[in-house]
Amino acid sequence: MDHIRNFSIIAHIDHGKSTLADRIIQICGGLSDREMESQVLDSMDLERERGITIKAQTAALTYKARNGEVYNLNMIDTPGHVDFSYEVSRSLSACEGALLVVDASQGVEAQTVANCYTAIELGVDVIPVLNKIDLPAANPENAIAEIEDVIGIDATDATHCSAKTGLGVEDVLEALVAKVPPPKGDPEAPLQALIIDSWFDNYVGVVMLVRIVNGTLRPKDKIRMMATGAQYPVEHVGVFTPKSKNLESLSAGQVGFIIAGIKELAAAKVGDTVTLVNRPAPEPLPGFKEVKPQVFAGLYPVEANQYDALRDSLEKLKLNDASLMYEPEVSQALGFGFRCGFLGLLHMEIVQERLEREFDMDLITTAPTVVYEVLQRDGTTIMVENPAKMPEPSKIEEVREPIVTVNLYMPQDYVGSVITLCTQKRGTQINMQYHGRQVQLTYEIPMGEVVLDFFDRLKSISRGYASMDYEFKEYRAADVVKVDMLINGDKVDALSVIVHRSQSQYRGREVAAKMRELIPRQMYDVAIQATIGANIIARENIKALRKNVLAKCYGGDISRKKKLLEKQKAGKKRMKQVGSVEIPQEAFLAILRVEDK
């Protein structure tokens, strides 16, 4: 066990984490040169394309150190994005050490800091590494100063390397062997194994990636999940040397996989503890929590006959993404679809993109909403994740909205515009610190404001230099109202939004004006109204198309013309009673793009 090292790599997006992982695998001879492709560990096409890591992956490697000893290195690649922070904390709790990779030309960024703090809280030793030192813009002294300033760990002897050229990567491995402690654990104790990740394989069912903390596991053992209590016989155990390789047993300190014929992913929850049925562990490993979705949106197929196909594709996606929630939903305007819950905005985009790309779905998505806590007059509290389910204003005592703590990092030049943005989004400033050229701002902002377009606008006002991460803080009472859109007196449920009262008038007017442009003129007048409860806050009219009925009257008596006009008016009135207005697709998409001023 003294020769095992478990480590993961922490880095901000694009700081070269996956490339460094590739180099390490190459040096340790995990794959032949023929099988080496860039970003070996990012197995989804989408991961390669966006250059982000979504699922955790591992590689068990052997490294012959300069002192002649052979070490077993278990590398656990973690996702770097804030939406997947729970997966990161699970991956980190399976390690004793973490490489903190910082781009020498860019310095420290928000998500690096967030994940690094997670690592320090979990008692993981953090080893700083400066990457991309081959770039002409690299400034290692500055980066070292920033690491010490912002994160507060000693970085004077940080290893310099360039993952792209392979320069200095061996020094990184040497530092790893020297500084990371070997795992603790007793191979003879009752089995405790932490599930780091799990995914669905078409041939063998669910594959669980585990870190064995205590005990030993062999094929044919019966295992039990401690959170769900389900039992399964083990079929195979083994490790990934990126390729899977079956072993006789896995014992304390190792990271490997278990295949046990599990049919659905919900049974193998990330963070759960696996133990043996006949010799159970007295207690599960700490830190398991059910992941709750934070952002909700409706997904509807463009063609109604695609509903079943959408359901099947969501089921298939859920096999590989346990944090995705969905339930059927009917909207009068959009037909049948699903209400889906996501961990955050990136997660939502990825799910949409995978549905469109891997399953060829054409989708309409409604505006993303967050979960509100509503205290009713009769004393009951309900959670509302869909504006259509919001009770009448007369029944509501108070509405509480989720507040998130947002950490923002940016160069000094952009502080002013970022503060303006946060104030527009009803944020309150908690803290502001200067670290050299970088500034760290901490704000509390309602989550509903963050999910709409906060991230895009932050990037555009700071020219892409600002970075952010957020975490849920609490529910707080707020003056939020539901704005409904009526078309000729009929409510269109898919267009309802929940906004703060101060923005409700503006929002109602904007949406009404936008719809007036997009709904084609009918044969009768169409009234578009925005309402809060029974109060109408905005109205737009679409004038009717009409035939000139007076064209054939030359001169003649006024009463003759009046008669024809009255007759036309009566006809239009009759039409209005039976006619229904088709709302084009563009109208729904336009609503999502109404900017909050």
Curated annotation (Swiss-Prot):
<dbReference type="Pfam" id="PF00679">
    <property type="entry name" value="EFG_C"/>
</dbReference>
<dbReference type="InterPro" id="IPR035647">
    <property type="entry name" value="EFG_III/V"/>
</dbReference>
<feature type="binding site">
    <location>
        <begin position="14"/>
        <end position="19"/>
    </location>
    <ligand>
        <name>GTP</name>
    </ligand>
</feature>
<comment type="similarity">
    <text>Belongs to the TRAFAC class translation factor GTPase superfamily. Classic translation factor GTPase family. LepA subfamily.</text>
</comment>
<feature type="binding site">
    <location>
        <begin position="131"/>
        <end position="134"/>
    </location>
    <ligand>
        <name>GTP</name>
    </ligand>
</feature>
<dbReference type="InterPro" id="IPR006297">
    <property type="entry name" value="EF-4"/>
</dbReference>
<keyword id="KW-0472">Membrane</keyword>
<dbReference type="Pfam" id="PF03144">
    <property type="entry name" value="GTP_EFTU_D2"/>
</dbReference>
<keyword id="KW-1003">Cell membrane</keyword>
<dbReference type="InterPro" id="IPR000640">
    <property type="entry name" value="EFG_V-like"/>
</dbReference>
<comment type="function">
    <text>Required for accurate and efficient protein synthesis under certain stress conditions. May act as a fidelity factor of the translation reaction, by catalyzing a one-codon backward translocation of tRNAs on improperly translocated ribosomes. Back-translocation proceeds from a post-translocation (POST) complex to a pre-translocation (PRE) complex, thus giving elongation factor G a second chance to translocate the tRNAs correctly. Binds to ribosomes in a GTP-dependent manner.</text>
</comment>
<dbReference type="InterPro" id="IPR031157">
    <property type="entry name" value="G_TR_CS"/>
</dbReference>
<dbReference type="InterPro" id="IPR000795">
    <property type="entry name" value="T_Tr_GTP-bd_dom"/>
</dbReference>
<dbReference type="GO" id="GO:0003924">
    <property type="term" value="F:GTPase activity"/>
</dbReference>
<keyword id="KW-0648">Protein biosynthesis</keyword>
<dbReference type="InterPro" id="IPR027417">
    <property type="entry name" value="P-loop_NTPase"/>
</dbReference>
<dbReference type="GO" id="GO:0005525">
    <property type="term" value="F:GTP binding"/>
</dbReference>
<dbReference type="GO" id="GO:0045727">
    <property type="term" value="P:positive regulation of translation"/>
</dbReference>
<dbReference type="GO" id="GO:0003746">
    <property type="term" value="F:translation elongation factor activity"/>
</dbReference>
<dbReference type="GO" id="GO:0005886">
    <property type="term" value="C:plasma membrane"/>
</dbReference>
<keyword id="KW-0342">GTP-binding</keyword>
<dbReference type="GO" id="GO:0043022">
    <property type="term" value="F:ribosome binding"/>
</dbReference>
<dbReference type="InterPro" id="IPR005225">
    <property type="entry name" value="Small_GTP-bd"/>
</dbReference>
<dbReference type="InterPro" id="IPR004161">
    <property type="entry name" value="EFTu-like_2"/>
</dbReference>
<protein>
    <recommendedName>
        <fullName>Elongation factor 4</fullName>
        <ecNumber>3.6.5.n1</ecNumber>
    </recommendedName>
</protein>
<dbReference type="Pfam" id="PF00009">
    <property type="entry name" value="GTP_EFTU"/>
</dbReference>
<dbReference type="InterPro" id="IPR009000">
    <property type="entry name" value="Transl_B-barrel_sf"/>
</dbReference>
<dbReference type="Pfam" id="PF06421">
    <property type="entry name" value="LepA_C"/>
</dbReference>
<dbReference type="InterPro" id="IPR013842">
    <property type="entry name" value="LepA_CTD"/>
</dbReference>
<keyword id="KW-0547">Nucleotide-binding</keyword>
<dbReference type="InterPro" id="IPR038363">
    <property type="entry name" value="LepA_C_sf"/>
</dbReference>
<dbReference type="InterPro" id="IPR035654">
    <property type="entry name" value="LepA_IV"/>
</dbReference>
<keyword id="KW-0997">Cell inner membrane</keyword>
<feature type="domain" description="tr-type G">
    <location>
        <begin position="2"/>
        <end position="184"/>
    </location>
</feature>
<keyword id="KW-0378">Hydrolase</keyword>
<dbReference type="GO" id="GO:0097216">
    <property type="term" value="F:guanosine tetraphosphate binding"/>
</dbReference>
